[in-house]
């Protein structure tokens, strides 16, 4: 498959603010000293062993945003866990702050949203999913620097903390790729990669999820007005149907009104 699928995970640093007390504090814009920024990212192309990693140890994240925008501009599909609500909006927001033009629009596959919609897991976190799905690389917790301490030590320029952040970020991307591939046959809203592969000029019948030509027709799919051939992909396991209906007597067919 030559469709460019980017598996992506970003990490952000917290805002630095002045506050009067520890709890129940409403922070006004004037209290913000430094705004939250993207501190690192890890990314890889689907099925490629190469992993891209970059961190930002400065007070200005423009360089890392330029790198991210360049990757997004090259991608056709982006896989991210909670990407619709976190990763992509964070990148867009920081790009806007720096006056960077938007990349080419991409399709987003949000594995967190898919887990919430399609499955009844006790948790939709990447850590839990990697455990319950028995992934080879399970998302782990922090090691020497637990929780917020990791980000705090990175801001203090602790080299050990930066190394731990790098390992944490890269492992997240490896885990995310495996979770995505396990979920793939269940994703009913997945972009049609066959259409993207051929730019609409299909010469071979292939699975719209994984672009495999190992298609096994099994029965029929029905709507209120049509009958279609139904198939299962023998590579990813996903189900689909043909676009054209096979029932001919459409003029004599009635449908429900109320």
Please annotate each region the language model reported.
Residues 1-72:
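Conserved RNase H-like, two-metal-ion catalytic cores of nucleic-acid enzymes
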Residues 47-132:
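Conserved DEDDh/DEDDy metal-dependent 3′-5′ exonuclease domain
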Residues 79, 128-200:
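Acidic, Mg2+-coordinating catalytic module of metal-dependent nucleases/exonucleases
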Residues 202-205, 230:
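Residues immediately within or flanking Cys/His clusters that coordinate Zn2+
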Residues 206-210, 233-236:
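Short cysteine-rich clusters marking metal-coordination/redox-active sites
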Residues 216-221, 243-247:
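Short Cys/His-rich "knuckle" micro-motifs
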Residues 220-230:
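Short linker/helix segments within small regulatory modules
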Residues 234-256:
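Short metal-binding segments enriched for Cys and/or His
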């Amino acid at each position: 498959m030559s469709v460019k699928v980017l598996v992506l995970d970003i990490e952000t640093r917290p805002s630095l603010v002045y506050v009067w007390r520890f709890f129940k504090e409403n922070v006004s814009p004037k209290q913000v000293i430094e705004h939250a920024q993207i501190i690192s990212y890890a990314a890889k192309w689907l099925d490629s062993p190469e992993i891209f990693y970059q961190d930002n140890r400065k007070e200005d994240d423009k360089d890392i945003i330029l790198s991210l925008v360049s990757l997004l501009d090259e991608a056709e599909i982006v896989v991210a866990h909670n990407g619709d609500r976190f990763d992509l909006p964070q990148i867009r927001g920081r790009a806007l702050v720096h006056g960077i033009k938007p990349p080419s629009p991409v399709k987003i596959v949000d594995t967190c949203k898919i887990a919430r919609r399609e499955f009844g897991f006790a948790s939709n976190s990447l850590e839990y999913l990697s455990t319950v799905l028995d992934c080879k690389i399970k998302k782990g917790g922090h090691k020497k620097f637990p929780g917020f301490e990791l980000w705090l030590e990175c801001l203090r320029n602790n080299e050990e903390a930066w190394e731990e952040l790098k390992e944490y970020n890269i492992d997240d991307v490896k885990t995310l790729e495996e979770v995505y591939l396990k979920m793939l046959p269940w994703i009913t809203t997945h972009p049609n990669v066959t259409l993207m592969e051929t730019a609409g000029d299909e010469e071979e019948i292939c699975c719209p999820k994984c672009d495999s030509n190992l298609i096994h027709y099994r029965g029929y799919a029905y709507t209120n007005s049509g009958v279609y051939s139904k198939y299962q992909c023998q590579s990813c396991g996903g189900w689909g149907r043909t676009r054209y209906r096979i029932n001919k007597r459409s003029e004599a067919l009635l449908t429900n009104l109320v």
